[in-house]
Amino acid sequence: MSLKKNQLRAILNSSLGKLADHIIDSQSISICKQVVELPEWKRCKNVCLYMNMPKKEVRTRCLIDVAFKEGKNVFIPKCIGSHVMEMYQVFEKTESLTINKWGIAEPNGESRKIMDDETDCELIIVPGVAFDEKLSRLGHGKGYYDNYISKYQSWALQKESRANMFKVGICLKEQILPNREIPMDTRDQKLDALVTPEKVIRNI
């Protein structure tokens, strides 16, 4: 993990922490409207979403509500160890979520998870601290999503018939670095698409 990444995180976390709730809410609604129009969203049966932090990132309640309304199976992450997470299924009327040390709701780990019983993840919605227009992502530095995506891809490759995971980042306008590339290393996963409040950027 380079100093440059840490510097970017510090700068972005400081500015994002100052964003008013109404700005985050407005941008989150715009992002939700674009995500649910993606062809990958429309055709997926299983979708991996995330429960947002109290501040600093796109709010996902709208996406979760739409996914349930459309009859999709919804999976959200639970951190189960150092740099390790799993995606567990949650249900519309669930009361089994707990709050972790980062203030994020997560499942209790007792339901079905992706890769159990050949369960595919066709679409994963990925948070982050910063993004660039070349579909690079800067996370929080723990490697949870990079490690999980790598593990899923290895599993899907072995199974051959399993669905490829389409990776969509969602970000506030303030999280985009328009004139700067995020430093990447061999473990970092590129996105397939990035949805901002104003546009969709795809890996063509």
Curated annotation (Swiss-Prot):
Belongs to the 5-formyltetrahydrofolate cyclo-ligase family. The keyword ATP-binding applies. Keywords: ATP-binding, Ligase, Nucleotide-binding. It catalyses: (6S)-5-formyl-5,6,7,8-tetrahydrofolate + ATP = (6R)-5,10-methenyltetrahydrofolate + ADP + phosphate. Its EC number is 6.3.3.2. GO terms for biological process: folic acid-containing compound biosynthetic process; tetrahydrofolate interconversion. One of its GO terms (cellular component) is cytoplasm. Substrate binds at residues 57, 102, 140-144. It is an enzyme of class 6 (ligase). One of its GO terms (molecular function) is ATP binding. ATP binds at residues 5-9, 139-146, 188. The lineage of its organism: Eukaryota, Fungi, Dikarya, Ascomycota, Taphrinomycotina. This is Probable 5-formyltetrahydrofolate cyclo-ligase. InterPro entries: FTHF_cligase, FTHF_cligase-like_sf, NagB/RpiA_transferase-like. Pfam families: 5-FTHF_cyc-lig.
